[in-house]
UniProtKB/Swiss-Prot annotation:
Domain of life: Eukaryota
Gene that produces this protein: Fbxw10
Physiological role: Probable substrate-recognition component of a SCF (SKP1-CUL1-F-box protein)-type E3 ubiquitin ligase complex which mediates the ubiquitination and subsequent proteasomal degradation of target proteins. Overexpression is leading to degradation of CBX5 and CBX1.
Gene3D superfamilies: 1.20.1280.50, YVTN repeat-like/Quinoprotein amine dehydrogenase
Annotated organism of origin: Mus musculus (Mouse)
Gene Ontology BP terms: inflammatory response; response to wounding; tissue regeneration
Compositionally biased spans, kind Basic and acidic residues: 716-733
Coiled-coil portions: 963-992
Stretches assigned to the F-box domain: 280-329
Annotated region (Disordered), positions in chain: 709-773
Official protein name in the record: F-box/WD repeat-containing protein 10
Amino acid sequence: MENREPKLKQAPYFRCEKGPNWVPVCQKCEACVLAWKIFATKEWFRRVNDISQRRFLVSILGQLNSLYLLQYFQNILETTQGKDFIYNRSRIKLSRKGGKEEEVVKSSLNQMLDKTVERKMKEILYWFGNSTHRTKANYTLLLLQMCDSNLLLTAANVIRVLFMKEWNSISGLHDDTPDVMFFPEKKYSGTQDTSYVSWAARPKPVSFPMSKHLGNKLGTENVDRETTEGKGESSLQCIHEMNRQIFGKGGMSRLGDDPCNLLLSLDHVQLLSSGYSKYRDFIRDLPLHLSKYILRMLDKHSLNRCIFVSQHWATLAQQVKVDQSMHSFIQNQISLLQVTKEEKQAYTGSYTRGIDPNYANKVSIPVPKIVDDGKRSRSKNQKWKLRTKTDYNLWNAYQNQETQLVQMEERNVFCGTYNIRVLSDTFDQNRIIHYNGGDLMAISSNRKIHLLDIMQTKELPIEFRGHAGSVRALFLSEEDNILLSGSYDLSIRYWDVKTGACVRIFYGHQGTITCLDVYKNRLVSGAKDGQVKEWDIETGKCLKTFKHKDPILAAKISETYIVSSCERGIVKVWHVVTAQLQKTLTGHEGAVKCLFFNEWHLVSGGADGLVMAWSMVGKYERCLMAFKHPKEVLQVSLLYLRVISACGDGKIRIYNFLNGNCLKVIKVDARGDPVLSFFYQGNRMVAHTDSNILVFQFENVKWQYSSDKNKVKKSKDKEEEREETSLGDEHSRSTIQGHSLKDSVSSKQEFSKSRVHLKQTKNLSSDDMETPVGEVSHPLQKLWKVPMTPDRFLLTISALQQAHNSEEFAYPHRPRPQVIDAWGPSIPYPRKVLSLKGKSVQHAVDQLRSSNLPTGVRQTNIPLEIQKLQPNLKKSLHSPRVQATVPQPSLIRPKVSDSLRGDEHLTSSIDGTMRRAGPLTSMQVIKPNRMLAPRGGTATLSPKKERPRFYTTLDPLRMNTGFMLMTVKEEKEFAEAKMKEYEASVSTKEVDPGKASKAAWIRKIKGLPIDNFMKEGKTAAPELGQNVFI
């Protein structure tokens, strides 16, 4: 019990009893000696340089050979690891006036002091090593009061290293170690896992190297500990023994061969002040390329934190930054070389792939159906099935869910042309901005906030000061005269925009403020402490608190809901009134950095490069749509069913929320810097990157809705039809001549003028005629809308023969006859269906003959001439040597007026009169109607190298060539008659002996069997037939 020390908490209250408290009288007691040593230390400690201060402080702490003393100072210096202490220590020290002169004077004084200070340090260390625990505690406390923030941090690191070394040494004691005593604290309880104790016996040192190289080096220098016997040994040997216990085998450091050298060297000081960790730095042991590969996976913020881990990590982090910047530069150069046509149009502001920047429409969008109790209703009898690429749209997103249609408006916002104005081109990684419409924008890069006039590109003289830390979140409402700022100092400040005064401060968060949002008089804030708080702006009170397990990155508020997201990738929807969690949305594989929601939908953007769309109705938690990005999404918004997103590749994209198509790509910065945020109001958009702030001014758009477009299109079609009708009437009046009756009649053919609008005829009596429904009207698209000119009208007749053979028209715009037949008649006549029930067929035929054509129909009679062609008869079937019934080819074309041609009259192959075709048939004799036509050249045929074609003369009257209704018996008889007619037309052909001989030789050469080859050895038998041999 002799080694037992009093409680150190009472050590500062020990004073000399022989004199007053402020002047030590006795110079022999412990309190007086301590006071004198403190006074002597103050004379030189604050005047020496930082290196000397650090050496002396670390040497003093190295003399603390008690575990209880180390724990006591470790608890005192625990506050140095706090956030406010670190921030205060990292602040830049502003130089005072005349700093250079003071540095020169201080350097000269240091040179004079260095000669005597080292001797004074060793004297105090010698005295400190022989002092009691109470004296060591008092002197150390007073010495720490003279240290600045950097020295206090060094002291905390050294004490932590010494404590861990001493604790590991105690845990390595052998079981037979005698005289082990400990003194637990007052709050000690047997249920605690660990208890810090003070050991009275000297423990056995255990090697604890700081690094592999140092451990091997120091391990060879360890010597056996010399044991002290009795009290006659000198104090120097005792101090040397103590230092060997602390530094010798512990692997920390050794003072050298001189036992009186108590002042540590700079290498030992740096080793002790570097800190201690029981974990091993595996990054340091890995090869350089693997270490850089691992650090390259971190984001930008985490990589900046790695710089403060150690010097080795700082070097690696700097190299990774340089590699990433060079890689991004190379990729940008490659992308500029490989830019496509669509991207060029997108970068220049034009829309691509036929996107209409004026498009607008009102569509019905499905949303989950909610029953009366607030729960969503599920649809029955629906099976899950795989969806194709075309099925990924909003209408097919709801599976196994009943929906209802809600009318919404869609527009192609920000898809037109724009102008760019640069507000700032200064590179600043710490800059944040906020713009909410109007002419002012809030900017902050440090603890101060400024306002920028967008129209004049000028910074206002008002400056907002008051934050103790850098500003991390801003919200500006110029209309409501509100400016809110969240800072690193854990506070939220409410500023007056006009005066710059701080109106109110909101306290409550325990982490850095990361996001702010306002709805009316309600404020929502998120911080790194994982809390989302709702505040009343007028009173400054916290109304509700919502919690996450990870730091909050985004938070939004509306009248009904509060939506928040965290670094884990979880999005939570809270109800404002009941403060209950409505639903939790999971799907992102990284941190969700931005949010936006309205009454029906919610969009979230994350570090995984996805923008996910969700439903805000009820508790439906499935993802509706996903929009892929090449890099992380930093800002997202939803406007008129268009998703606007800012990506880390330096581009703003506009997607169609309904089908996921990308409508527009806007390249904000040519360097490819990430688009940190964007804000829009009307036709103006503000984009923010690390290197600049840009304003995109889009053109004013007059939205054209689809219903208006249809009306305009119908009106245009009607106007075109009216113009075509009027033109057709005038053309028919000028080109068509009236009929003239004369005695001479020539061949004629009747044609009806095309593209004439007919009036519907009066229906026949219901007893005789029936008009089927749906066969009267045809769409306008089915009409043949090719304008009919005189030349085209004449060419129609010459193309009849080719149309009859190839079933194709000579016009490039008119469809084939099969298609026209499928469409039905181009003129909307009511189809007449004979009703012969109870009536004779002859009566119906007479009634049809007596019926006239509808009024308004004009008939044009055009005479035709038939010209027989004279082909080359040498290789033709019409040669006299060939007996065939193939008719001679002929050409049918309209007969041109003789008054316009000087040639001889063409003779018609048809003599007599022309028969006019009425509704059925008629034998009226009509006079030919001469038609004016331009001079046409005669058709020349080239029979050589061309396969002969066979033409049949068309029946100009078109009699018995239409559809005939027959019974089975009549059809059989008709087929037999046609067969007999064909057999009668085919006659036996005379065999040319020369050709037969040639063919026989050819067969002989090919090796084919020939029965009557050369007719050798055979006897002619003419009585049996011509060319018959026996």
